[in-house]
Amino acid sequence: MLSLKNAARNGLASRFDCICADVLDIRSVTTHGSFDCVFTNPPYLKNNCGFRNADPGKFAAFHETTAGIDGFVAAAAHLLKNGGRFCAVYRPEYLSKLLFSMESRDIRPKRLRIVYPSQDKPPCLVLAEGKKAAKDGMITEKPFYIYSDNTHKHFSSGMNAVYERFSCGSSRLVNNND
């Protein structure tokens, strides 16, 4: 599994568990309320949208082939303890759908950050964090820029800080895209 391989290469394998299961069948493989944090980067394109990759795995990674955001949030709500954190990477054009789904599953949005490739480009991602069975109140973080300019050759100081923070002593993180 790619996530476990990357975690091991970056010295993080002991810090999390990874479940390989159908999100719609999560109740059969886990116990309700057994996780402190659930992180998801779910598929966000409708089946009839965008480039249709011939590789079924790659197609499923980007397209809602079996479950939409509501299925992923429902799975997270099942997995999380009260007070547990839900973290999602999603597309900005579907932000309202994500927030509505979180609220409807008793996961209160707590932090939101919009990610831009650079200052002259429209947003490409949203990072949302919620807390199960929490009180209302959300912080909107300042925008995050991946690149320092529109050439997209140099990371921003914020992106460099992310690499430094999570490098665990290595000079840079390893991303195994095999």
Regions found by a protein language model. Name each.
Residues 21, 112-115, 149:
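Conserved beta-strand termini and adjacent loop/short-helix elements that scaffold enzyme active sites
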Residues 1-4, 8, 45, 99, ...:
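Class I S-adenosyl-L-methionine
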Residues 33, 37, 42-71:
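Mobile active-site "lid"/loop adjacent to the S-adenosyl-L-methionine
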Residues 28, 49-50, 98-99:
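Short glycine-/acidic-enriched loop or helix-start segments at secondary-structure transitions
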Residues 123-178:
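SAM/dcSAM-binding transferase cores
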Residues 65-123, 127-128:
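Conserved Class I SAM-dependent methyltransferase catalytic core
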Residues 2-36:
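S-adenosyl-L-methionine
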Residues 25, 44, 132:
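Short, glycine/acidic-enriched loop or turn micro-motifs at the edges of active sites
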